[in-house]
């Protein structure tokens, strides 16, 4: 499926597979080990003999700066021992070198073709809730992101509306929800990409469709009917429903 990857400066499209880390090859084994350790993987894909020294150095510096929260993995795309991973991530059709930032849950949080900077990789390390949102989208599902301060007056009503939306036969099995506390420091970078004010006293719910299009934005109260209306509008081609926008720093809303 086509997924929109969040980068520090732009949106990069890459073909990714939700089960890529389950492929039986040596890179998949490394990804599994790193993910189970709760770390990010910075994966450098390249062709043997290509000049990748500067990219390799950037990845090395990013790993050092992550202070135990990330590991580097290097993959020669011609290596048959990593063939499944290369195929599943669509790297055989991508410009090389390519660096992917992969969260512990397997979500690709950013992709950098050609070159990357250590800070860009650091920015790609979104928190667990942000990674969960991205994984849901990369699995081809709709995600409802509920940004709720502790003690939000609308939390109960919002939870009921979202539960009804997810249970509706029109979308059952194809929607997930993630609740994010705006005070959670680990999620500040992701909230910034969503353009949600973490200091707001009110709750904000975002309806996001693959690859990362925000098709509905709801402040405090939200209804199942409103969400389905915005979803239908986006499927009909009017992606400006509910405010439009995207879940990346370069998205400027409806274009």
Where in the sequence are the language-model features?
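Non-catalytic, surface beta->alpha helical segment in thiol-disulfide oxidoreductase systems
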Residues: 100-130, 209-241
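Short, well-ordered secondary-structure micro-motifs
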Residues: 156-157, 189-190, 218
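Structural motif
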Residues: 45-49, 77, 103, 113, ...
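Thioredoxin-like thiol-disulfide oxidoreductase module
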Residues: 28, 57-60, 64-108, 124-132, ...
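N-terminal leader/targeting and pre-domain segments
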Residues: 17-39, 115-140, 233-255
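Local sequence-structure signature of Cys/Sec-based thiol-disulfide redox active-site neighborhoods
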Residues: 30-62, 136-169
């Amino acid at each position: 499926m086509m997924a929109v990857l969040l980068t520090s400066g732009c949106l990069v499209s890459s073909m990714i597979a939700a089960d890529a880390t389950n492929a039986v090859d040596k890179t998949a084994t490394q990804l599994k080990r790193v993910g189970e350790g709760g770390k990010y993987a910075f994966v450098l894909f390249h062709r043997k003999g290509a000049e990748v020294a500067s990219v390799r150095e950037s990845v090395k510096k990013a790993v050092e700066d992550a202070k135990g929260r990330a590991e580097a993995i290097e993959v020669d795309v011609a290596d048959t021992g990593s063939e499944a991973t290369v195929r599943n991530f669509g790297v055989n059709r991508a410009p090389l070198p390519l660096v992917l930032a992969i969260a512990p849950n397997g979500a690709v949080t950013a992709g950098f073709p050609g070159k990357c900077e250590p800070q860009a990789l650091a920015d790609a390390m979104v928190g667990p809730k942000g990674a969960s949102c991205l994984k849901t989208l990369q699995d081809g599902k709709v995600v409802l992101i509920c940004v709720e301060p502790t003690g939000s007056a609308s939390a109960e009503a919002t939870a009921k509306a979202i539960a009804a939306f997810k249970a509706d036969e029109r979308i059952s099995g194809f929607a997930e929800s993630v609740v994010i506390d705006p005070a959670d420091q680990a999620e500040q970078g992701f909230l910034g990409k969503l353009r949600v004010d973490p200091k707001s006293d009110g709750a904000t719910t975002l309806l996001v469709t693959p690859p990362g299009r925000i098709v509905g934005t709801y402040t405090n109260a939200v209804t199942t009917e409103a969400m389905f209306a915005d979803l239908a509008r986006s499927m009909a081609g009017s992606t400006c429903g509910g405010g439009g926008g995207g879940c990346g720093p370069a998205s400027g809303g409806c274009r």
